[in-house]
Amino acid sequence: MGFSETQEELVLRSWQSMKKDSESIALKFFLRIFEIAPAAKQMFSFLRDSGDDVPLESHPKACESATQLRKTGDVKVREATLRRLGATHVKAGVADAHFEVVKTALLDTIKDAVPEMWSPEMKGAWEEAYDQLAAAIKEEMKKAA
């Protein structure tokens, strides 16, 4: 299934609403990942030895993924970015199951951030955007392995 104009509009509209609070939302996103899969913290080089206190809000890498869409204004990702993401994910030991954890955390975070906008259609749009990005990263991971 492709990413339709309607789905892109839903993602961009919700992102417009969320971007004013993107740092806080990024923090909630990462904390949700660690709530679902506590061991995931070890996959982030800047968090490996941080103990229980995770100062994500002051670390630029923590917000990078959440703000990428805002910077580009588009859901498409450049080839160079995909190659870098693929190599980074291989180096970190990311597996298919990790992508599902991130997807769940992402959807939960967005639902909490824009409850007045949340709908089955919006959920589907974010799922499609995420699934396409995850598939592209996985493809680059195969090349980098």
From Swiss-Prot:
This is Anaerobic nitrite reductase NSHB5. Its EC number is 1.7.2.-. Residues 2-142 form the Globin domain. Heme b binds at S45, H59, K61, R84, T88, H89. The gene is NSHB5. GO terms for molecular function: heme binding; metal ion binding; oxidoreductase activity; oxygen binding; oxygen carrier activity. It comes from the Eukaryota. One of its GO terms (cellular component) is cytoplasm.
